[in-house]
Structure formats: C-alpha cells, structure tokens
Regions:
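Extended, loop-rich substrate-binding clefts of extracytoplasmic carbohydrate-active enzymes
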Residues: 380-391, 463-490
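Residues that flank catalytic or metal-binding motifs in active/ligand-binding sites
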Residues: 156, 255, 383, 415, ...
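Long, acidic, intrinsically disordered low-complexity segments
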Residues: 92-118, 133-167, 248-264
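Extreme N-terminal basic, low-complexity initiation segments
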Residues: 2-9
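Carbohydrate-active enzyme catalytic cores, enriched for enzymes
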Residues: 289-432
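Extreme N-terminal leader/anchor segments
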Residues: 10, 16-29, 33-36, 41-134
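Active-site rim segments in enzyme catalytic domains, especially the processed small/beta chain
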Residues: 413-476
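Aromatic-lined, polymer-binding surfaces characteristic
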Residues: 149-331
Length: 490
C-alpha cells in the first residue's frame, strides 16, 4: 500500500473573482519555503522524495525553454518572420512563379479513433451527439444558429467526419459526408463570426477536412470539389490572421495544429508550416503543466490534446516527414496523466466535468498515440492521486481546482474521491457537466459542478470553491497539503 511525500498544492487566483465560496477568517498564514523540486517521474519503481511543505506554484505551465521550436536555418527564420507579418506563402515559396492551384498533396491515414455508433447514425440521417439524435435535414448550419456547446463543437468542428470514417468503407460514407459538407458550405460560404468561426472550431474543422479529405473531395461534382478546396485555403488564411484570438489554450492548440497541417498538405505551404510549428510548440508549453497534465485538470481536454497531436503526426507521416521532437515529447508527457485516472474497468473517472469515458475509447486513443507508459506517479499540478491495492483503485482529488482562465467546466471537487474494485465502480462523482447540452440538460450543468455533486464533505451546503457561470470558478480552496508514502503491507 502507498501513501505520498508531503506536498502542498496552491491556487492563487482569488483576484480573478470577488465571489467567495466559504467565509474566510482573514487570518494570514505564512507560506512555506521550497527546499527542493521533485523530478517528474512515472510509475517506474523509482522513489523520489520531497521536503515537507514544498509549495507548487498554481498552474505552472511548461517554460518555453522546455519545448523549443524546431531548429531551422537563418533563411528559414526570415521566411517564418516574413510570413508572420503577412507576406503570402506563394511569394515566399516561388516569388517568380505562378500561384499553385489548391489541392491536397497527400492522403492522410490517421489512427485517431472515431465513434462507429455516431457514424452509423449519420448514415441513417441524423447526428448523434451526447446521446441526442438530431436530423441532418433539420440542422441549422448557419453561424448565427443557437446550438448547445456539444452540438457547436461537433457540427462546426467536423469531428463527425472521424465518426463517419469509422462506420463503414469509404465508398459507402462519401455520399453522407458530401451531403453534410454541401449543407454547411451553403450557410458558411465566407468566414464570419459566432461559434462556427471560433478559433477552436475553425481549427478542428480545417484539420478534419485535411485528414479526411477523401470523404469530401471524391465526388464527381467539380463545383463542390472546387468549393471545398477554396474553403480550405481561405480557412487556413483566416487562422493565420486570427489564431491569437482563441478563447483558451486548448482552442489555440487546435488552431496551430490546423495551420501546421495546412502547411504540410496544401501547396506552397513551407512558410506556413514554419510559422505553425513555432506557434504550436509555444502553445503546448502554455497548455500543459510540468507533470504532463493540462492546466484545466480535465481528462476530456487531456484526450482532446492527445487526439490533435495524433492527427497532426499522421499529416507528417503522409508527407514522409518526421514531426518536431517537441510534438513526440509532448505526446509522451500527455498519456501518463490520463492513465492515472483509469479505474479497474480501464475507464476514466468523473473529474472536472468529464463523464465515465469507456475503456475502449481510452485504449483506442492511447494505442493511436503510439505511447507506451504507466500511470503518472509523481503527480504535481494534475492533482489526482491514485492508490492501487490488490484489485481496488482509489482516485483522490488532492489539489485546488483549476484557475478560472483555464477551466471550461470547472468543478469544486477538492478532496473528492472515487473507488473501484474488481472491475466495479463503488463510489463515483456525478460528472457530466462538460456534456451538458446533450442528454444532460444545460439547466443542471452548474449543479453538476458543485461540491455536492462530488463524493466529498460539503460544509453548510456550500461549495468549497465558488462555482460561477460559463464554466468558471471563483475564490475558495487555495492550497491542499498531501502526505503520501509507500507502506509495507502486513
């Protein structure tokens, strides 16, 4: 059995909100000085010790020095700088030649898994999003449509292409893909505003188009093919200009992945690829903490980040190029924290708005990543302690909630736990706040983020950290002290 070396987790975003979750006595407590820093270490049997009272700074992202952009020549640095300031890629790639016609340079084979059930539903004529069926014929694809977040993400992010590809051979799904694509283009001929043109949805959309191009470019209709290719190029240019207006770091990473993929797969893309790689490495360093967990502490966001890098790596493979080492290193960092949230049934726990993700989905994503690793043991900002004894698994939220600027479905779950044994879940949290807008009603989303929706003690029916609108969190828990040690069993 194990317990862990003393560790203090800090959250210092009280200034981001005036709302207090619990009355504070106003008593100032001196911070404990840090005498040492633990090394990131996965469950490899090694033992690292921390001095008692070490304080982890809240949400420390990786430093840029941890993940430097790929090494390039002085000439390429000038090209990247010129492209960043708006010089067209065609002028930098072939200044004396004609502009190349839009086309896809190679076919991508991504191992990123789709959901077959959702793909079958699409072929039957409706979207299947978080358990809700929505007929394609009745879907409003316009930028001004009032859709719930899960529908916005799926419909405008084109993640459904991945599901469709997983449901049947290519020739059987092309008609459905082109039908939905044509309907979307009719309402979104030019870049606009609203959820359809958020950086995240736009980045996911362009990346899906590039990865699954055969599904939307195999028609005999030259007009549709021309429209799709033109839309790819204009979308890539839009992302070049608007990437820094992303709502959060995960959305920015999606945008940078799409820019880099466009640089790989569209003609005259070398300047764009240089621009995209540098931006992506920087954004990844700001998304992920030094133990490999995303700063939102959300397993769903962790899975999304891994999936984006899997798709992008497949784009490099399609062009017979090696991805930057930083991308491979980041994938290796992202997988162990996700595995730390696996129960005995190999599915994920319900944390920070996520639901009980099935074992099959987790296994398929980890296999697609190509990373073989054990669950993260030296947990820092990720905050979830995992204790294994025989056939039982205990998961414990031993950290303050994520900072408001990082959270999308932030939950007041400090000191909550989940327990499973023999493949059965014994104690669980409610979870599901991030899924609100499907079968989970939007009206209860805020309640699912409350302390009372988690398996922990609630004092006076108050949240341990203030739960605000829009997935944000206010003041409350700022520090959690953990004492974990390995004990010999009797």
């Amino acid at each position: 059995m194990e317990a862990a070396a003393p560790l203090a987790m800090n959250r210092e975003d009280a200034g981001e909100s005036e709302t207090m979750a619990l009355p504070l006595n106003g008593k100032d407590e001196a911070q404990v000085n840090t005498a040492g820093r633990a090394a990131s270490n996965h469950e490899t049997g090694g033992h690292e010790t921390r001095d008692r009272g070490e304080v982890l700074e809240p949400g420390r992202a990786l430093a840029i020095a941890d993940f430097a952009p790929p090494s390039i020549s002085a000439g390429e640095r000038l090209i990247r700088l010129a492209y960043r300031f708006g010089v067209p890629g065609s002028a930098l790639s072939s200044p004396l030649g004609k502009t190349a016609k839009p086309r896809i340079l190679s076919t991508v084979a991504s191992p990123r898994p789709g959901r077959r059930q959702a793909g079958v539903a699409l072929r039957a004529g409706h979207f299947l999003i978080n358990g809700v069926k929505a007929p394609i014929a009745q879907m409003d694809f316009s930028p001004k449509a009032r859709l719930t977040p899960p529908f916005e993400h799926t419909v405008h992010g084109f993640g459904w292409l991945r599901d469709l590809a997983a449901s049947a051979p290519r020739d059987q799904v092309i008609p459905t893909a082109e039908r939905v694509m044509a309907a979307w283009l009719e309402e979104n001929a030019k870049p606009g505003k609203g959820p359809a043109w958020s950086v995240e949805n736009t980045g996911n959309r362009l990346l899906a188009w590039l990865v699954h191009a055969p599904l939307i470019l195999s028609s005999g209709e030259a007009q549709l093919r021309g429209q799709v290719l033109a839309q790819m190029e204009s979308t890539a240019r839009w992302l070049d200009r608007n990437i820094r207006s992303a709502d959060d770091r995960l959305g920015e990473v999606a945008g940078w992945c799409a820019i880099t993929a466009a640089g790989l797969l569209l003609p005259e893309g070398h300047p764009r690829r240089l621009f995209g790689e540098a931006g992506l490495v920087r954004a990844l360093g700001e998304l992920v903490a030094d133990d490999g967990g995303v700063l939102s502490r959300s397993p769903l966001a962790q899975m999304e980040a891994i999936g984006l890098l899997v798709d992008l790596t497949a784009c490099y493979a399609a062009m017979k190029l090696d991805p930057p080492q930083a991308i491979e290193t980041m994938k290796s960092l992202l997988v162990p924290p996700l595995l730390a949230l696996m129960h005995r049934d190999a599915g994920l726990g319900n944390w920070q708005g996520g639901g009980a993700v099935s074992a099959d989905r987790v296994a398929a994503l980890v296999e697609a990543s190509g990373v073989r690793a054990r669950p993260l043991k030296d947990v820092r900002q990720w905050g979830y302690q995992r204790v294994v004894a025989d056939k039982s698994v205990l998961q414990f939220d031993a950290a303050p909630p994520p900072l408001s600027r990082h959270s999308r479905s932030g939950c007041a779950s400090t000191l909550a736990f989940e327990l499973s044994a023999n493949g059965q879940r014994i104690v669980v949290n409610c979870g599901g706040a991030a899924l609100a807008g499907g079968q989970v009603p939007v009206r209860i989303e805020q309640g699912l983020r409350a302390t009372a929706a988690h398996s922990t003690l609630a004092l006076d029916n108050a949240n341990s950290t203030a739960v605000l609108l829009g997935g944000k969190l206010g003041s409350g828990v700022t520090e959690v002290e953990v004492d974990r040690r390995t004990l010999s069993s009797l």
